[in-house]
């Protein structure tokens, strides 16, 4: 082919080839209303995934900043990522601020945010720890802490709004996926959105391949590896959803719990055992979704 041929317009040839394929291929299906809903669901679930990931990163930043400004705080409460602690740190972003504040003000802040769970005794503990704290007084870090907490609050509001929209779409779906113990609306929606119509796949193994959960094959000459690793080439979103939801199913469904325990007893690493349970879950989901039946605990 000469170089001038590379710039030749062949749109009409492509259009003719596409039209002929659409006319002659009987296996092709029209774009249905259900497909539209699943695409809309996919956009929402992936957006929710990105917001949850960002929230996790921001919470890590808060933990880092608290370690710099008020390291003793994490020893006084089970978790610093709660409303009462956020409320205190937004107004008093550092040990030096907590140490110099009036006890009544501090008590009011944490009592209101915790709905009475934390009171004067906890306020005294916070202030005493702040007065002997080794935390640094860095105004720039304190400002960053306040802004990061505000970011987390905004992201959480966005997540709630997205989850409400996902719930609306799931109410319109004819699915039995949430009948499985451990699969809630959000994770069920995530799986449905990534897989789409289960009937598009000839077998559950095709779904596993689509998720990148099929074992890879290594071959050199006549030697074929018997220690195949997972491919991890498919949809990372579907793989993430399946792995995470499998952990919940193994907690709430006795059959899967026993299966996970069996794999662990065989000496398999926890993550490897979860991957085996995830494959079993996919086969089960394929069966109930294609047959339109509810899951029944054995």
Annotated model-derived regions:
Residues 1-298:
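A detector of single, family-specific signature residues
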């Amino acid at each position: 082919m000469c170089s001038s041929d590379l710039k030749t317009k062949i749109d009409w040839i492509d259009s003719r080839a596409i039209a002929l394929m659409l006319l002659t291929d009987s296996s092709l299906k029209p774009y249905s209303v259900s497909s539209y809903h699943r695409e809309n669901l996919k956009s929402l679930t992936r957006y929710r995934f990105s917001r949850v990931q960002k929230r996790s990163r921001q919470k890590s930043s808060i933990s880092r900043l608290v370690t710099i400004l008020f390291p003793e705080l994490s020893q006084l409460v089970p978790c610093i990522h709660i409303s009462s602690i956020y409320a205190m740190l937004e107004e008093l972003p550092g040990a030096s601020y907590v140490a110099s504040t009036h006890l009544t003000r501090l008590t009011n802040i944490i009592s209101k945010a915790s709905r009475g769970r934390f009171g004067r005794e906890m306020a005294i503990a916070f202030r005493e720890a702040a007065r002997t704290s080794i935390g640094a007084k860095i105004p720039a870090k304190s400002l960053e802490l306040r802004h990061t907490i505000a970011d987390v609050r905004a992201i959480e509001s966005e997540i709630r709004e997205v989850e409400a929209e996902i719930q609306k779409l799931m109410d319109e779906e004819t699915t039995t996926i949430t009948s499985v113990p451990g699969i809630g609306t959000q994770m069920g929606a995530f799986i449905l959105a990534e897989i789409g119509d289960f009937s598009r796949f000839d077998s559950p193994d095709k779904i596993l391949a689509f998720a990148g959960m099929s074992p890879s094959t290594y071959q050199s000459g006549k030697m074929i590896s018997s220690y195949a690793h997972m491919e991890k080439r498919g949809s990372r979103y579907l793989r993430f959803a399946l792995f995470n939801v499998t952990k919940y199913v193994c907690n709430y469904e006795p059959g899967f719990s026993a299966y996970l325990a069996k794999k662990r007893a065989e000496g398999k690493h926890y993550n490897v055992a979860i991957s085996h349970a995830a494959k079993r879950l996919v086969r089960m989901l394929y069966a109930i979704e294609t047959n339109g039946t509810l899951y029944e605990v054995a």
